[in-house]
């Protein structure tokens, strides 16, 4: 996969050399799309402030990006913190290229053009999903299913919110209810999430996409009083134990135990 990614970058650089005119990102609002399947695109929006600075928007979240490199007719946008790159050719204020996470060997087709609209709306929302939702991901697969809590705020067609899980959340989600269709997305470089589904005032049945490498179904029902289990209850000692107890060999074959003198009266972190 790394070989394929290298070929993609070389091909893009070669196309740059065929055109000597230097191109830059034009100021303004853009709508980007990641082609995560044959039928689904994951949209997000960003604003170019100048040739070297842009802002990615996900609901209340604003991600400032300032590592932008130009080579003739192409741009290479390095997302902050994460090992992620948007590499694209610039033509008539339109971008065509790939979203690349080289460390994980992932490549997703990427396009962007001038627009402020994240999701198109064609119909009045037939449901309002503001509130709390008791959610189950992969409900029909015993080894994969897990619980979550959907928390949303809807104003007309526009929706923001997230899914909370026992170990975190699904970032800042932004989207719409279009008739009975729900669509939510977020993109920050490390995470590229899309949620689609059918909604009523009391139920949601949909699909969660993570980039182009993972998808799973989910169901949700409105429950104003729903709470996730306490985070303090996720890790516990088995019955009959009042502390951790283990012994294992270190790199030199010496036995290491939590009861060794060197650990007494010290804070020990076990991962």
Enumerate the language-model features and the residues they cover:
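Bacterial Sec-dependent N-terminal signal peptides
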Residues: 1-27
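A short, compositionally biased domain-edge/stem linker segment
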Residues: 16-20, 115-122, 228-234, 253-257
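Central antiparallel beta-sheet cores of small beta-barrel/beta-sandwich binding domains
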Residues: 24-90, 119-199
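Short, structured interface segments
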Residues: 95-121, 206-232
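N-terminal "domain-start" segment that seeds a small globular fold
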Residues: 223-261
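Alpha/beta-hydrolase fold active-site loops
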Residues: 265-268
